[in-house]
Each structure stands twice: as C-alpha cells, then as structure tokens.
Amino acid sequence: MKLKGTKTEANLMAAFAGESQACVKYQYYASKAKKDGYVQIGELFEETSRNEKEHAKIWFKLLHDGMPGTAENLLDAANGENFEWTDMYAGFAQTAREEGLDEIAALFEGVAAIERAHEERYRRLLANVQDGLVFSRDGDQIWQCSNCGH
C-alpha cells in the first residue's frame, strides 16, 4: 500500500495520535471515577479506553504495513526516547525557563533523564536480541518465572 506522503497517511497518523491520547486519558478518568466512588462509571471509562486502544492499533498497523518485529520495535522505541530526552524535553525546558516557569522546566528535565534511561534500556535489550542473549547467558544465572515468581 502506497501511503507515504498522502493525505491519508497524515489522517492515519492523526487518528492514531487521537485514539492513543483518548486511551490514556480515559484510564485517568476511570481511576478518578473509582476514587470518587463511581465504580460503574470507572468501568465504563476502562472499557472505552480498551476500545480506543484497539482503534489506535488499527491505524498503527496500517501505517506500518502490519506489526513490526521486536528488534525493529526496540530500535524505534530507543530512537523515540532519544528524541524525547535530547531534543523535545531539552527544548521544552529551555522555553519554560525563558518564560520564568522554572518548576515546569525542572519537571521537563527530570522526565528527560528518565527518557534517557529508557533509551539505554531499549538499546541493551536490542543488543540482547541481536546477540541471542534473551533466553541464555554465559555462566550461572538466576531466572525467575514471570508468572509464579519461582
């Protein structure tokens, strides 16, 4: 499918962004509704959030001609995190400082540090996938079952 550069590609990207934001926003709304004692409303927000997640997945898969592989996803995630900490949040922090909003600038800088750690983690995981070290290691290792904890 030839989407590159089309208005439809832009529409798919906007649809993906909108559905993704709605998914997360409705999770926040669900949490607040439940804290306020509105369990049924919270559950409705959770259900709708799951719906929005699936809608986002439709648009994502069309944009990427299916679901990319794990190595490709790790590289994409690492590159995205790199952009966030080196460019996006650095720029946001600078703007906030210029506007006298030092507390917000500090928050941007703090999140940038977390994004840097995310990038490093994704790059280590990608190296493990590429080197065949996800399920095996040299020497003695302790493995823990992610289901039962044993």
Residue ranges and their predicted role:
Residues 1-150:
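Non-heme di-metal
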